[in-house]
Structure formats: C-alpha cells, structure tokens
Curated annotation (Swiss-Prot):
<dbReference type="GO" id="GO:0005886">
    <property type="term" value="C:plasma membrane"/>
</dbReference>
<protein>
    <recommendedName>
        <fullName>ATP synthase subunit alpha</fullName>
        <ecNumber>7.1.2.2</ecNumber>
    </recommendedName>
</protein>
<keyword id="KW-1003">Cell membrane</keyword>
<keyword id="KW-0067">ATP-binding</keyword>
<dbReference type="GO" id="GO:0005524">
    <property type="term" value="F:ATP binding"/>
</dbReference>
<dbReference type="InterPro" id="IPR020003">
    <property type="entry name" value="ATPase_a/bsu_AS"/>
</dbReference>
<dbReference type="InterPro" id="IPR000793">
    <property type="entry name" value="ATP_synth_asu_C"/>
</dbReference>
<keyword id="KW-0997">Cell inner membrane</keyword>
<dbReference type="InterPro" id="IPR004100">
    <property type="entry name" value="ATPase_F1/V1/A1_a/bsu_N"/>
</dbReference>
<dbReference type="GO" id="GO:0046933">
    <property type="term" value="F:proton-transporting ATP synthase activity, rotational mechanism"/>
</dbReference>
<feature type="site" description="Required for activity">
    <location>
        <position position="373"/>
    </location>
</feature>
<dbReference type="InterPro" id="IPR033732">
    <property type="entry name" value="ATP_synth_F1_a_nt-bd_dom"/>
</dbReference>
<keyword id="KW-0375">Hydrogen ion transport</keyword>
<comment type="subunit">
    <text>F-type ATPases have 2 components, CF(1) - the catalytic core - and CF(0) - the membrane proton channel. CF(1) has five subunits: alpha(3), beta(3), gamma(1), delta(1), epsilon(1). CF(0) has three main subunits: a(1), b(2) and c(9-12). The alpha and beta chains form an alternating ring which encloses part of the gamma chain. CF(1) is attached to CF(0) by a central stalk formed by the gamma and epsilon chains, while a peripheral stalk is formed by the delta and b chains.</text>
</comment>
<dbReference type="Pfam" id="PF00006">
    <property type="entry name" value="ATP-synt_ab"/>
</dbReference>
<dbReference type="InterPro" id="IPR027417">
    <property type="entry name" value="P-loop_NTPase"/>
</dbReference>
<comment type="function">
    <text>Produces ATP from ADP in the presence of a proton gradient across the membrane. The alpha chain is a regulatory subunit.</text>
</comment>
Length: 513
C-alpha cells in the first residue's frame, strides 16, 4: 500500500493538531557559594521559606534564609560535588514525609525513606513536616493515663495521654532506658509509638531496635533515625518528621507516644546551621529563635477533641478523641538544669523527670529525684488505685531525704524519726526496678500497697527486692482474678482493699523469701 504526498501531509497535520504541550514554569537559580552543607543561590526570586529546592542528582535543599539578592539553603545530604555555577530549581513544595500504618515496625531516615533493608513502605500518603499545632478550642484536657511500667514514675510523676513530659539528666543516667521501657510497655495498650534518634551512634540505635524487637514492641513502633554522621539539616528536621508520623494516628482518633532522643543534639545541629547561615548568635551561641524551635515542635503533642477528629476525617471517625504524648529528652552538663536549652524545654513541657548521676551511681535505678521531678497535668489522668495508694510514697521519700541529711549530724534519734528513716529507706529500695522489666498496674498496686500498709517493716533491707518478687508471684498465682480485675479497671474500693490485705496477710504468714 502506497501513501501519496497529500495523505502524508494530512496525517502530519492531524498529529500536530493533536499534540499537546505540557509546560511547567519553574524558577531557576545558580549556586554562588558552597560551604559546610550550606549553599547560597542567586536568581530564585519567588522561593518560599522552607521550600524544597531541587539539586542535581535527585537531591534537595531547604531554603532557610531569604535575603535581598540571594537565598541561603541547607543541603539534605551529601554536598561534596556541588560547586559554584551549578543550576538549581524551585519546586513549589514544602518538605513532606510519608505517613501511615505501613511505617509501623520500620526504621526510616528523616525523609521517611526505609533504611532497614525490608523493602519499600506502603504509606497512606504524605504530610508536611511543619504543621501548625491544634488550637485551644480543638484540644481536650488530659484525663487518660500512659503507663510507663515504672513504679517511681507511675506513682509519683504520672503521665497522661496528650502530655509533654521531659526526661532530663546528665549522660549515662538512664534517660534512653526509661523512654525505651515506656515504649515496650505500650505493646498491648493500643498506643502507637514513634522513637526519634537524633545525633546518636548507629551502633546505639541498632541496639535499641534489637531490644524493641526482642520484647515484641517494634511492630507497634516507627523508628526515625538521623545519626551523628548525617548532615546537620537531617538532624534538625528529624523530630518534625517523626511528629508528623505520630500526628497521623492522633488525627484519626487514636493514641500515639513519641520520644525525642534527644533535643539537645537537635539544638546543637540548628545552632550549627544558623551560624553557617550567618544569623546573629545569642546566649551560648544559639540563635534567637531556639525557643521557637522546640515550642512549635512540642505544642504539636496534644489531646484533640471529638469535633477535631470528625472534621479531620470528614466524618469517617466519630465519637473519638486522639492524642499525641511527647517524651522529649534533654542532656544536661554536670547537672546544670539552668542552662539555656534545658530551661527553655522545662518551661514548654508539662513537667519533668529529673535523673541524677549520684542516685544512679548509688544503685538507685531508675535514678529519679522525687524532689524536683514533677508532673503538672498527669495527676488528673492517674489510674484510681495508683492515685489512692501512692499519696504517701512521695511524702515518705521527701521526708526520708530530709531526715537522712539531718541524721548525719544528730547522735541520738527518737523512735518516730527512726521509724520514718526505716520506712523511707525501704520505700527507696522498693522503687528500684530493672531495665526491660515494666510492671503492670496490678503489680505496681500490690508493691505500693505493701509499702503503704507497713508490710515492709519486718523485711530486711537487702531482702526487699526478694520480698517483692515472691509477693508478686504469690498474688499472680493465688489471686489471679483480683490482679486481672485491677489491670482491666484500675478501680480501688473497700472490697479490693480487703482482698489485697487478705492476700498480703496470707503471704506474710505462709511464704518465705
């Protein structure tokens, strides 16, 4: 079959008429300077604050300094091959990360890319890393507990769903251990967890992931990693990425817990970026907006009301409140809580758990200082039975500390003072707890009941731990129904008190430890 010239020209004309040009207008600029992960770009007239700038090699930078004739941007990744004269483009997009249930059980980097070798992630969409926190009207008061599994915390410094509770202390005082145990304790509670590791060694993070897996908590947890060897920009943005992943559950009427380990390293990364961008330094060389750096992050942790959830899900979820509980960690230097970053975060959060080196070294673990540790809103969320029983624990410990210091100077003590000291030292011993061994509400209740009702008086100090272990074993076997009831309801009444007393009386009379 032969086509004549007329048919060929008609065919070409038809194809030309059908051809659609898809044009995209994008602003292009030129790199004029590169130094330490910071690039200065000329020619990007319409760039937004925080916008992603496309670099060669499928990399991005984030615009942080918008100046009269140039833009200062921080590179998200390696920058060694970038040089003066390289062309870059605006994207019109703010940085987003993948969110959804597919991230549970996975280890990802700041950008939400998997780094655990388990293949691609099945996400439910994307969310911006910078989100405005829910307003006052959209929030609900904190009234449900987050059980950490630690007697010392759940009894004296209770944490509620939607609260921000700071864990603060020097290095090697058990801050990460406490946060990891809190995550492990949520594996059957329905609370989804996010662990954000900032500026840590890769080996340390690998160990944390392994421990979570061993205790069956990884399937319920998202691990976001920005190691010490990664760019300062990734360390600075990691907490915001993790927060967006946690907000996915909060906004759908579920409960989530996020651990930032730790925000001191994030502040250092932000200080590095700010100094390289030539922003004026302030106290301790931190930039002027370092308070806002943490406040805008921690304000996103909240308990939102039913109206907010219904509005967000467009009616798909009704009658449910959502919460995001934050446990930020701050590392102090030589116990100095009055330094710049610690005081900032203390003023933002709803309380703090202060861990002391001296207590840790003396064998008291968790090394919680009950004197300056406080929970400002958790009391309303505390489980009924723990709240009722633990009232005297904090007082006993505070009085014991005071009397112990005083008794060093006094040669003879009256019987009442000696009894208080004996009680205080036994309660202190009872508060000790091993790592990776979180306790149920019922187990905590039995231990605290024994201390409050004077059952420890006749127990040798060095045998308090053995007494507790034997008591819990006895109660779990002989009073399993009571333990189950306490775990399920958390109630405390005369009937439960009578059964606890009967169980303890029988244990003391018949058992050895």
């Amino acid at each position: 079959m032969q086509l004549n010239s007329t048919e060929i020209s008609d065919l070409i004309k038809q194809r030309i008429e059908q051809f659609e040009v898809v044009s995209e207008s994008r602003n292009e600029g030129t790199i004029v300077a590169v130094s330490d992960g910071i690039i200065r770009i000329h020619g990007l007239a319409d760039v937004m604050q925080g916008e992603m700038i496309e670099l060669p090699g499928n990399r991005f930078a984030i615009a942080l300094n918008l100046e009269r004739d140039s833009v200062g941007a921080v590179v998200m990744g390696p920058y060694a091959d970038l040089a003066e004269g390289v062309k870059v483009k605006t994207t019109g997009r703010i940085l987003e990360v993948p969110v959804g249930r597919g991230l549970l059980g996975r280890v990802v980097n700041t950008l939400g890319e998997p780094i655990d070798g388990k293949g691609p992630i099945d996400n439910d969409g994307f969310s911006p890393v910078e989100v405005i926190a829910p307003g006052v009207i959209e929030r609900q008061s904190v009234s449900q507990p987050v059980q950490t599994g630690y007697k010392a915390v759940d009894a004296m410094i209770p944490i509620g769903r939607g609260q921000r509770e700071l864990i603060i202390g020097d290095r090697q005082t058990g801050k990460t251990a406490m946060a990891i145990d809190a995550i492990i304790n949520q594996k059957d509670s329905g609370i989804k967890c996010v662990y954000v590791a900032i500026g840590q060694k890769a080996s340390t993070i690998a160990n944390v992931v392994r421990k979570l897996e061993e205790h069956g908590a990884l399937a319920n947890t998202i691990v976001v990693v920005a190691t010490a060897s990664e760019a300062a920009a990734l360390q600075f943005l990691a907490p915001y990425s993790g927060c967006s992943m946690g907000e996915y559950f909060r906004d759908r009427g579920e409960d989530a817990l996020i651990v930032y380990d730790d925000l001191s390293k994030q502040a250092v990364a932000y200080r590095q970026i700010s100094l390289l961008l030539k922003r004026p330094p302030g106290r301790e060389a931190y930039p002027g907006d370092v308070f806002y750096l943490h406040s805008r992050l921690l304000e996103r942790a909240s308990r939102v009301n039913e109206i907010y959830v219904e509005k967000f899900t467009k009616g798909a979820v009704t009658g449910k409140t959502g919460s995001l509980t934050a446990l930020p960690i701050i590392e102090t230097q030589a116990g100095d809580v009055s330094a710049f970053v610690p005081t900032n975060v203390i003023s933002i959060t709803d309380g703090q758990i202060f861990l002391e080196t001296d207590l840790f070294n003396s064998g008291l673990r968790p090394a919680v200082n009950p004197g300056i540790s406080v929970s400002r809103v958790g009391g309303a969320a505390q489980t009924k039975i723990i709240k009722k029983l633990s009232g005297g624990i904090r007082t006993a410990l505070a009085q014991y500390r005071e009397l112990a210091a005083f008794s060093q100077f006094a040669s003879d003590l009256d019987d009442a003072t000696r009894a208080q000291l004996e009680h205080g030292v036994r309660v202190t011993e009872l508060m000790k707890q091993k790592q990776y061994a979180p306790m149920s509400v019922a187990a905590q209740s039995v231990s605290i009941f024994a201390a409050e009702k004077g059952y420890l008086k006749s127990v040798e100090l060095k045998k308090v731990g053995d007494f507790e272990a034997a008591l819990l074993s006895f109660m779990n076997s002989e009073h399993a129904a009571l333990m189950k009831l306490i775990n399920e309801t958390g109630d405390y009444n005369a009937e439960i008190e009578a059964e606890l007393k009967a169980g303890l009386d029988k244990f003391v009379a018949t058992q050895t430890w």
